[in-house]
């Protein structure tokens, strides 16, 4: 039977790895199928190329996972015995049980016992073989049978399986294992059994009436399913070896000049090797499944530890990178601004709030801002430091800078006033009475107490005409303020520029409204 599948040019399908090459070499047509001017990948599936080459038989995937030969052979024997016992309880025909065991042997020559559960694959092979041989069984029955076999093997009282979440998970695992078997075998699940061949050969030898000989040869053939002879030799050679072994056991003479099996295409070397493999089963000790499962678990843990050690997850092992710096960037010693110009970096939100609250509390509790000269200089230096650390959005607008520079109060005064203006919080505008020195002095304390409770001003932007009028007012009143005492001048410097300017402006423009009515 040949099948061609479309795919990449010149590539072999990976699913044919389990049955791609046999003793006769590569099958013709496996290099591809030429359709028109394109070459499509081809898979030639025959009963001859289902045999495994010697290199796969000598070094199996289980050996690469760390299992020794005896442990792997014991697992193969136990798995085939489970399939045979489950088939008997499920009342499957012998052909279906033989198909399940052959599929089991083929699968574990492509996969490891360490990575795949032997019991789950056995259940999947029984369920798959029952459908292949047209004697299907429900997967629930297969699970119940294997559950009973496990309790009998452990010498426990059989208990019905509870239909809980564990049962659902087991059912899903068996379905996945069945799909995995089909994928690894390339859906080449047809098995040619030697049962009918034995009867046909005995008819040729005129020994079909000897029921004892027929039954003994049949028994040897069923026992040979636990070995690897079905993946190494043709069914005709296996049938001849079973007849030869049964005749030698029952001491029934058969033609030997020439040997009778040469008529059916078998060789003497193949007959001897098959007989040796079958007789080895009867000399082996009874397999302890618990010991085999413990060996498999040890190999699993060893592989997991090796993987974790390679990734650096275990304590005392170094990760793939030398240090944690490979996962996160190293901390910077200084900010970019400090490295470039030596200027301090802008403070964080909490530190900026603390710096703002300090001057506010001092101004709110001091009567008429009557601070000493040392305290005045400290507050001025603090306001300057805060104005330097402010972001550009909090500084004065260009128009206000222009008006400050145009004033006659001097460059140093305007510079200090602009800095203190940027640091002062916004105020709500109130309309007051015309300016009177005595009233301002008397009500200054009440104004400072109300300062913290006032709502912020909605907008800081003012028109250029207002700034020009303010500058004119400052120049007109400069002479008037100079006549006052130095004590009042120091107080005026300490107060924020915006507060005094807004008070003068609205008190002069709107004489009918006063902030403190009497």
Swiss-Prot record:
UniProt cross-references to PANTHER family, sorted A to Z: CYCLIN (PTHR10026)
GO cellular component: cyclin-dependent protein kinase holoenzyme complex; nuclear speck; nucleus
Location(s) in or outside the cell: Nucleus speckle; Nucleus, Nucleoplasm
Gene3D superfamilies with a match to the protein in the record: Cyclin-like
GO molecular function: cyclin-dependent protein serine/threonine kinase regulator activity
Family per record: Belongs to the cyclin family. Cyclin L subfamily.
Source organism: Mus musculus
Region feature (Cyclin-like 2): 196-280
A Pfam family it matches: Cyclin_N
Top-level taxon of origin: Eukaryota
Main localization, broad class: nucleus
Role noted for this protein: Involved in pre-mRNA splicing. May induce cell death, possibly by acting on the transcription and RNA processing of apoptosis-related factors.
Comp. bias regions, Low complexity: 405-427
Protein name: Cyclin-L2
Organism placement in taxonomy: Eukaryota, Metazoa, Chordata, Craniata, Vertebrata
Compositional bias of kind Basic residues: 455-469
Keywords of this entry: Cyclin, Nucleus, Phosphoprotein, Repeat, Transcription, Transcription regulation
Assembly: Interacts with CDK11A, CDK11B, CDK12, CDK13 and POLR2A, the hyperphosphorylated C-terminal domain (CTD) of RNA polymerase II. May form a ternary complex with CDK11B and casein kinase II (CKII). Interacts with pre-mRNA-splicing factors, including at least SRSF1, SRSF2 and SRSF7/SLU7.
């Amino acid at each position: 039977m040949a099948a061609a599948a479309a795919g990449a040019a010149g590539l072999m399908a990976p699913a044919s790895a389990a049955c791609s090459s046999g003793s006769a070499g590569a099958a013709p047509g496996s290099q591809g199928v030429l359709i028109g001017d394109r070459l499509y990948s081809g898979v030639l599936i025959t009963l001859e190329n289902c045999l495994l080459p010697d290199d796969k038989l000598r070094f199996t995937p289980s050996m690469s996972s760390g299992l020794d030969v005896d442990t792997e052979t014991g697992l193969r024997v136990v798995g085939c015995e489970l399939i045979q016992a489950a088939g008997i309880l499920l009342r499957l025909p012998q052909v279906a049980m033989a198909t399940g065991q052959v599929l089991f042997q083929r699968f574990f020559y492509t996969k490891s016992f360490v990575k795949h559960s032997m019991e789950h694959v056995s259940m999947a092979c029984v369920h798959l073989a029952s459908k292949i041989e047209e004697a299907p069984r429900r997967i629930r029955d297969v699970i119940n049978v294997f559950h009973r076999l496990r309790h009998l093997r452990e010498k426990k009282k059989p208990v019905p399986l509870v239909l809980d979440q564990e049962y659902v998970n087991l059912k899903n695992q068996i379905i996945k294992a069945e799909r995995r078997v089909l994928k690894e075998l390339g859906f080449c699940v047809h098995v040619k059994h030697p049962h009918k061949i034995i009867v046909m050969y005995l008819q040729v030898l005129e020994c079909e009436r000897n029921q004892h000989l027929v039954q003994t040869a049949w028994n040897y053939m069923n026992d040979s399913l636990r070995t690897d002879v079905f993946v190494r030799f043709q069914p005709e050679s296996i049938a001849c070896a079973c007849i030869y072994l049964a005749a030698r056991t029952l001491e029934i003479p058969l033609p030997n000049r020439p040997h009778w099996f040469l008529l059916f295409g078998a060789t003497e070397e193949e007959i001897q090797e098959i007989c040796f493999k079958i007789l080895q089963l009867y000399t082996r000790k009874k397999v302890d499944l618990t010991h085999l499962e413990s060996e498999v678990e040890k190999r699993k843990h060893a592989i997991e530890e090796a993987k974790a050690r390679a990734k650096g997850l275990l304590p005392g092992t170094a990760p793939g990178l030398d240090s944690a710096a490979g996962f996160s960037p190293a901390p910077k010693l200084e900010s970019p601004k400090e490295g470039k110009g030596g200027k301090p970096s802008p403070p964080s939100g909490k530190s900026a709030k603390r710096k703002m609250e300090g001057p506010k509390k001092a101004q709110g509790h001091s009567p008429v801002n009557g601070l000493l000269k040392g305290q005045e200089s400290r507050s001025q230096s603090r306001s300057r430091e805060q104005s330097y650390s402010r972001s550009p959005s909090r500084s004065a607008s260009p128009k206000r800078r222009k008006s400050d520079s145009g004033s006659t109060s001097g460059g140093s005064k305007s510079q200090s006033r602009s800095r203190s203006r940027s640091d002062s919080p916004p105020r709500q505008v109130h309309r007051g009475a015309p300016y009177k020195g005595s009233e301002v002095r008397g009500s200054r304390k009440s104004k400072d107490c109300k300062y913290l409770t006032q709502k912020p001003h909605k907008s800081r932007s003012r028109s250029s005409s207002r700034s020009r009028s303010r500058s004119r007012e400052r120049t007109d009143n400069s002479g008037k303020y100079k006549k006052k005492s130095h004590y009042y001048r120091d107080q005026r410097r300490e107060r924020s520029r915006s507060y005094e300017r807004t008070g003068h402006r609205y008190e002069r423009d709107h004489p009918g409204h006063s902030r403190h009515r009497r």
